[in-house]
Amino acid sequence: MDNKIVYVVSDSVGETADLVVRAAMGQFPFAPDIRRVPYVEDTGTLKEVISIAKSNQALICFTLVKPDMRQYLLTEAAKEGVEAYDIIGPLIDQIEEITGQVPRYEPGVVRRLDEEYFKKIEAIEFAVKYDDGRDARGILKADIVLIGISRTSKTPLSQYLAHNKRLKVANVPLVPEVDPPEELYQVAKEKCFGLKIIPDKLNHIRKERLKSLGLSDGATYANINRIQEEIDHFEEVISKINCQVIDVSNKAIEETANIIVNAVQNQKMF
């Protein structure tokens, strides 16, 4: 049995069946010849695999989620004297019996979930890398660009959009003494969102921030005149970009995020 052939049949990529077969075969001193047959959608393909397996005296291991396909393979393989092992079917049936829930019978679900997970991780890493204007190159790479003065929820909003919407978000702080990065004027305005807040609200937030750091709330950072100067600068920059502005004064992060997501969906950007 040095070259025992195993046909791995799947209605998706076949990674699950492949891994299970290799794990099982690893318990034996011979090297199997594993041949994967992915994306099987019809009984014609199954019939062909059974015929080939019979001529090669091979074993068929399969992950097919649709009951009719599973039953067809088991029945026809038995008629031809071919050993066929259902890797996932009995477990699906058992879970259905225990939970009373009807399965989706949808191929490739795990793979799609994995892809979504990695998209989320990528978006989170992007938000960290391009947080607070650390690298202006992120502006042109981002799905969303948040623009605002200090303490307008840019960072938590970036993280929320990454975690929950898998969007790559860069955020850019604006201060009167520093010219905005040129990339802000190069990126599509539809991707940009200015975050504004009423002066009194921001004044309170900044004072609380200073107190939490053990600093005097009389610092310039929390001075109402300084805040107004920053807001004026923000409005000047935003008018040049001509992007949508969201008043975050009394909005939760989730509410602001929904406004942004609805806007980009309406524009069919993603």
From Swiss-Prot:
InterPro entries, A to Z: Kinase-pyrophosphorylase, PPDK_reg
UniProt keyword Transcription present: no
Keyword field: Kinase, Nucleotide-binding, Serine/threonine-protein kinase, Transferase
MF-aspect GO terms: ADP binding; ATP binding; phosphotransferase activity, phosphate group as acceptor; protein serine/threonine kinase activity
Residues making up the signal peptide according to the UniProt record: none
Chain positions recorded as ADP binding sites: 148-155
Catalytic reaction list: N(tele)-phospho-L-histidyl/L-threonyl-[pyruvate, phosphate dikinase] + ADP = N(tele)-phospho-L-histidyl/O-phospho-L-threonyl-[pyruvate, phosphate dikinase] + AMP + H(+); N(tele)-phospho-L-histidyl/O-phospho-L-threonyl-[pyruvate, phosphate dikinase] + phosphate + H(+) = N(tele)-phospho-L-histidyl/L-threonyl-[pyruvate, phosphate dikinase] + diphosphate
Keyword Transferase on entry: yes
EC number: 2.7.11.32, 2.7.4.27
Root EC class: transferase
Pfam families: Kinase-PPPase
Xref: PANTHER family: PYRUVATE, PHOSPHATE DIKINASE REGULATORY PROTEIN 1, CHLOROPLASTIC
Function: Bifunctional serine/threonine kinase and phosphorylase involved in the regulation of the pyruvate, phosphate dikinase (PPDK) by catalyzing its phosphorylation/dephosphorylation.
Family: Belongs to the pyruvate, phosphate/water dikinase regulatory protein family. PDRP subfamily.
UniProt name for this protein: Putative pyruvate, phosphate dikinase regulatory protein
Organism: Bacillus mycoides (strain KBAB4)
Record lineage: Bacteria, Bacillati, Bacillota, Bacilli, Bacillales
